[in-house]
């Protein structure tokens, strides 16, 4: 039975099932749960957690997290809405977006408004507030390129603040929010988008699909089509999208790999390093379409781990660690998981522990 406690606008619930709120569909119960729609709600929730000596786990779209069966912590579920135009000129428009907005819906909205920049990131699961955390990226675009600033509640200073894109330290699947996960709760993200067409068509299959119809809408539609053809729908096949990061190796390491495996897909980076396609490594290690019990790597895209039937976190860990082992044996590369791993106290845990 739920026990509900009401504050000014916020409600705390006990023993709440989080299965609908994580895209891997893990069976998870939170000892304490609340949905927040404002900064005031966040302040009340944090005060409750402090009073009851609870850790805080901030839940966004649940598309990049691995959760245990029981979480003894306060889960704060972000639901801050709103899309507000701050300013615009001939070339740019600045838009402030609530952290609880669905990411894909926001991308569709920008295209409808004829704003450019985010079309390559269509159909990425999750909410706007999670996009800066791991600097989401796809088809040659990272969200950090179009973020002007991130609005936060700073738990250390106990106040709201704004962090410029430069101070977010965006890099491949990384940001300051990963370095200090317990400090900031993202409330809004301010984007600086283009008003003139500037389509990023760096990826071969995307360039070919877009063809001569160089509109934002066509680019977005082709990205959606390609993703849907390769990636499983989480409602049908529970997953967290790309499970592993594409490893980045130095020149010496790359020369060793290319000498042994001449067809290895790779992408040169600005600093002389080389990004390797993790999906190809997993496929070559024999894991594409392979299952270990109720968890496996998807048959159309080896980079996606799928929960086929009521898997537990232990089942998931057993599978991804087996994939890591086999890839390392073949290529001497240790794959790093993308989703964040939590323990039963709601704290982030290292995947290697």
Swiss-Prot record:
Write down the required cofactor(s): FAD
Active-site residues annotated for this sequence: 173, 242, 338
Q: Which Pfam families match?
A: FAD_binding_4, MurB_C
Catalytic reaction list: UDP-N-acetyl-alpha-D-muramate + NADP(+) = UDP-N-acetyl-3-O-(1-carboxyvinyl)-alpha-D-glucosamine + NADPH + H(+)
* Gene Ontology terms: cellular component: cytosol
Sorted UniProt keywords: Cell cycle, Cell division, Cell shape, Cell wall biogenesis/degradation, Cytoplasm, FAD, Flavoprotein, NADP, Oxidoreductase, Peptidoglycan synthesis
GO MF, any single term: FAD binding
Its annotated pathway reads: Cell wall biogenesis; peptidoglycan biosynthesis
Coiled coil recorded as keyword: no
All copies of domain FAD-binding PCMH-type, residue ranges: 26-196
* Enzyme Commission (EC) number: 1.3.1.98
Q: What class of enzyme is it?
A: oxidoreductase
Can you say where in the cell this protein is located? Cytoplasm
Q: Name one GO biological process term.
A: cell division
| Similarity-based family | Belongs to the MurB family.
State what this protein does.
Cell wall formation.
Would you tell me the protein name for this molecule? UDP-N-acetylenolpyruvoylglucosamine reductase
